[in-house]
Regions:
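Glycine-rich helix-loop "coupling/hinge" segments at transmembrane-helix boundaries
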Residues: 150, 226-262, 281-284
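Cytoplasmic-entry segments and transmembrane alpha-helices of multi-pass inner-membrane transporters
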Residues: 111-145, 174-177
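Short helix-to-coil transition segments within interhelical loops
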Residues: 182-209, 236
Length: 284
């Protein structure tokens, strides 16, 4: 028994199949033209940027040659005669990172609750606060450091304030998202027995999100330890000042020693904070 012949597809059938699987039919002429125009525009923009910044193969080659000379002068690494100042600067950077991140944590916790949609239900207030977080997150720590150096003078206080100002919005946004993702049933149970809004936050939301908050604090502290090493370049204290001074006088062996010290310090903090974060998340 032979199968009945299948009717050829109509133009409507072909159009429907093309709409569902456009890649199976290849690119249409208008789409191909748009793709070519996009590639040409991207290439023209790239060439324009290379011309604007005067990026040439000769400049790159000369720069790499100079970099190789500096790398050769870095070995062997040496702390020099002022190794105590280097260690003090490293300890100062770690302390700046901790104090700045901790101050940001204290301020960001209430802001995180205010920015959470399940705590503040007013759409305008929620939108305004979230956009404020986004705006503050766009300001780099170095800009804050330059501002606070001018306001309070040289030294670690400017670095602490810069880290704090830069981290408040970052932590507040992370906290708000964690609060919004918390299980609402605990808060609903507290509200069902007559608990106030503050009690719902204290006993329904905070126990769930506190481990996440502390984990984020540790992660940002680790990240800010690296950032604090750079803030000293603009006068905000820490090991960055030691790096800047030695680069000026071209003590490249001491520069490498400081870089290795920063690497070791960050590695130790990373290992410790990773273990603590794992326990916090497991406990949460």
């Amino acid at each position: 028994m032979t199968a009945a012949p299948t009717a050829p597809p109509t133009s409507e059938d072909i159009a429907a199949i093309r709409a569902r699987m456009p890649r199976a039919f290849g690119m249409t002429k208008p789409r191909r033209a748009r793709a070519i125009a996009g590639w040409l525009a991207g290439g023209a923009w790239l060439v324009t940027l290379l011309w604007w910044f005067d990026i040439t193969p000769m400049r790159i080659w000369n720069g790499l040659s100079g970099l190789l000379t500096i790398v050769r002068l870095m070995f062997p690494p040496s702390p020099g005669a002022q190794w105590a100042d280097i260690l003090q600067g490293m300890a100062e950077s770690v302390a700046m990172a901790f104090l700045g991140t901790f101050a940001a944590l204290v301020i960001a916790i209430p802001l995180g609750f205010l920015g959470a949609r399940n705590v503040v239900v007013n759409a305008l207030a929620h939108f305004s606060l979230r956009r404020a977080f986004d705006g503050l997150r766009g300001i780099d720590q170095l800009i804050w450091a330059l501002t606070f150096v001018r306001a309070v003078g040289l030294g670690p206080l400017a670095g602490v304030l810069a880290i704090c100002a830069a981290e408040i919005a970052v932590l507040a946004k992370l906290f708000a998202e964690a609060i919004e993702n918390a299980d609402a049933r605990q808060g609903e149970a507290i509200a069902a027995v007559g608990g106030s809004g503050l009690l719902r936050i204290r006993y329904g939301l905070l126990p769930q999100v506190l481990p996440v908050m502390l984990s984020q604090f540790l992660y940002q502290f680790e990240s800010n330890t690296r950032s604090a090493s750079i803030l000293g370049v603009v006068g905000a204290g820490g090991i960055g000042l030691q790096i800047a001074e030695r680069i000026k006088v071209r003590y490249w062996d001491q520069v490498l020693f400081i870089i290795l010290l920063i690497f070791a310090t960050v590695a130790v903090i990373d290992a410790l904070s990773s273990r603590v974060r794992g326990k916090l998340i497991g406990a949460g």
